[in-house]
Amino acid sequence: MLEDFRLKVFMAVAETGSFTKASRKLGVSQPAVSQNISSLEKETGAILFQRARGEVSLTSEGLVFKEYASRIQYWYSATSEMFGQKGKFTS
C-alpha cells in the first residue's frame, strides 16, 4: 500500500534529482531514501528513476507516477485539513 511518507520521499527525489539532496530536504538518511524508492519500485513493478553518477531523473513511468503522486498528496492534505485535529469537521 502506498504510504504518505513514501510519496514524500518520491516527490523529494523527483524535485531535487538526487537521493542525497532529498535526504537532506526530508531530514532522513540517504539509505532510508534509497530503501523507500527501492520498495516503491518493487511495489509498483515500475522503474521510476534512471540513475547515473549520483543524479537521478524520472523515467516515463516515473513521470506518470509523479502526476498521480501529486494528486494523492493533495488529497491527503485536503482530508487532513478538513478532518484533522483542528479541521472544519472536528469538534
Regions found by a protein language model. Name each.
Residues Q85-S91:
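Interdomain hinge and pocket-entrance segments immediately C-terminal to HTH DNA-binding domains
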Residues E61-T79:
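Short, solvent-exposed amphipathic helices
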Residues E41-L58:
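A short LG(V/I)-centered, amphipathic sequence patch enriched
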Residues M1-F5:
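Short helix-coil-helix linker/hinge
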Residues R6-V13, F65:
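Short alpha-helical "packing" element that flanks the helix-turn-helix/winged-helix DNA-binding module
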Residues S18-F19, I37, R51:
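Helix-turn-helix DNA-binding elements, focusing on the entry/boundary residues of the two helices
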Residues A12-G27:
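Short helix-boundary/capping micro-motifs
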Residues S29, N36-S39:
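Residues within the DNA-recognition helix of helix-turn-helix
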